[in-house]
């Protein structure tokens, strides 16, 4: 599981660094290279909704190992690509594997361990996932400079081989004995909605689409979602059952994830941009400055369980979400005169809070799911995580652009634009605290208590 999570996290950050080099090598306009990113993201958005059904139908071991193989073969094909078309097609294959790896891996954990151990196990398994984004930009820059852009993909091959070996040897094979009906129309509606919404977010953040196509894509996505849920209420076996939202911890976890990730999802975009554009850091120095954030997040994993045991999910998430928003706002106050040690301390504290936030949110969302709805609930969480992070980047890019106006990047007023953007993003994150306040004091502890009294 950890190997797959690491590959996914590494790929999310390493590719962007190499786009200019790819464009030069493939003799393409750099602006056209965004299709390399979009092909992967749209494939993942389209297939995540069906990951749970596929895993239950064909077995978690087979699908998880197969997903690693697809991702690895896709990486190999990307690494030997000699044209943009071949590279985009290879990224689609890589995206098919990526859409299944993490959701199915998390489903295996959910099925394998008692709920009272979920926080501890999830914290351990996601540690390598934190390493991926940490080393991605720096490793990508070094590979492009020292070797070539091809190696940002080829580096996945040995990792994938190791992951496949361990997946086949140690992954339990959970599979439904009775064949569950596949809701094909529901899949088309829901996946179509995910693709349309993802495309609108990419258009807003990276493709510089006009407002009309962005709004139209967003409306189409929302309309498809409405049609899906209206239909799901009236059929027997929908792709995602509306009954999932009768589980309070799941509903609160999903809604809280949306708002918290809307704020937090902007940080991988905003922080490096501010350090380089606002403070004049080099890409290498920016990567090194981000290290305390990830190291602190890793160091916080062992203390998440004791905090949740002591305070419970409700108090932990309400307090921590407010702190998260305040820390995001605090990044807006960083300026050219801010001592570097203060910046490093701020990022380290943010990393600690982040780690507690997302481990708590994710386990809260999954902790009360039963055997018959675990796959659907887990896939729904994966969909929300994918979309809300994209929404965070798109909304922060739009805010920064709006506050900047016609100001050139070297103008001192750009710092005011960053300041206003961080305040807004932090405020969005704080809104999640009101959602987590709807939890009951004992939520998240029920299963453990039942087992102890059994």
Describe the residue ranges of each PLM region.
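Hydrophobic alpha-helix/TM-entry signal in multi-pass membrane transporters
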Residues: 1, 64, 71, 87, ...
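Extracellular/periplasmic helix-loop-helix junction of adjacent transmembrane segments
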Residues: 18-46, 84-88, 284-288
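Helix-loop-helix hairpins in multi-pass membrane proteins, especially solute transporters
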Residues: 48-185
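Membrane-helix boundary and inter-helical linker elements of multi-pass secondary transporters
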Residues: 25-26, 31, 56-57, 79-82, ...
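Small-residue-rich packing faces within the transmembrane alpha-helices of Major Facilitator Superfamily
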Residues: 45, 72-73, 96, 157-164, ...
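Hydrophobic/small/kink-forming positions within alpha-helical transmembrane segments
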Residues: 42-46, 76, 130, 134, ...
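C-terminal membrane-cytosol helix-exit motif in multi-pass small-molecule transporters
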Residues: 157-175, 191-203, 220-234, 432-440
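12-transmembrane solute porter fold
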Residues: 1-10, 15-17, 30-31, 36-37, ...
């Amino acid at each position: 599981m950890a190997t797959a999570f690491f590959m996914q996290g590494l790929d999310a950050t390493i590719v962007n660094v190499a786009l200019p080099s790819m464009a030069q090598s493939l003799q393409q306009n750099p602006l056209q290279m965004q299709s390399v990113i979009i092909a992967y993201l749209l494939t993942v958005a389209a297939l995540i909704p069906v990951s749970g059904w596929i895993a239950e139908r064909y077995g978690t071991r087979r699908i998880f190992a197969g997903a690693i193989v697809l991702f690895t073969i896709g990486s190999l094909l990307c690494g030997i690509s000699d044209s943009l078309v071949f590279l985009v097609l290879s990224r689609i294959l890589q995206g098919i594997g990526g859409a299944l790896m993490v959701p199915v891996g998390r489903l295996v954990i959910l099925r394998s361990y008692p709920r009272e151990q979920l926080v501890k196990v999830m914290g351990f398994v996601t540690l390598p996932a934190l390493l991926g984004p940490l080393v991605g930009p720096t490793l990508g820059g070094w590979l492009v400079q020292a070797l070539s852009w091809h190696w940002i993909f080829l580096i996945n091959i040995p990792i994938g081989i190791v992951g496949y070996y361990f997946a086949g040897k140690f992954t339990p094979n959970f599979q439904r004995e009775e064949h569950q009906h596949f809701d094909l129309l529901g899949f088309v509606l829901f996946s179509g909605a995910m693709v349309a919404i993802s495309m609108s977010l990419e258009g807003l953040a990276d493709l510089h689409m006009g407002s009309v196509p962005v709004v139209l894509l967003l409306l189409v996505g929302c309309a498809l979602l409405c049609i899906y849920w209206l239909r799901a209420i009236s059929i027997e076996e929908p792709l995602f059952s509306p009954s999932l939202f009768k589980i309070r911890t799941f509903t609160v976890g999903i809604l809280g994830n949306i708002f918290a990730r809307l704020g937090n999802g902007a940080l991988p975009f905003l922080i490096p941009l501010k350090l380089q554009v606002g403070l004049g850091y080099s890409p290498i120095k920016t990567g090194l400055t981000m290290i305390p954030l990830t190291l602190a997040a890793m160091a916080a994993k062992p203390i998440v369980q004791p905090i949740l045991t002591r305070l419970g999910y409700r108090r932990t998430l309400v307090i921590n979400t407010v702190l998260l928003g305040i820390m995001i706002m605090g990044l807006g106050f960083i300026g050219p005169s801010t001592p570097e040690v203060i910046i490093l301390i701020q990022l380290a504290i943010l990393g600690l809070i982040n780690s507690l936030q997302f481990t708590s949110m994710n386990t809260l969302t999954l902790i009360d799911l039963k055997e018959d709805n675990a796959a659907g609930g887990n896939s729904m969480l994966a969909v929300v995580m994918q979309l809300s992070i994209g929404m965070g980047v798109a909304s922060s890019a739009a805010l920064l652009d709006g506050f900047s106006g016609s100001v050139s990047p070297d103008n001192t007023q750009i710092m005011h634009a960053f300041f206003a953007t961080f305040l807004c993003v932090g405020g969005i994150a704080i809104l999640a605290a009101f959602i987590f306040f709807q939890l009951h004091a004992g939520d998240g502890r029920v299963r453990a208590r039942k087992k102890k009294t059994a």
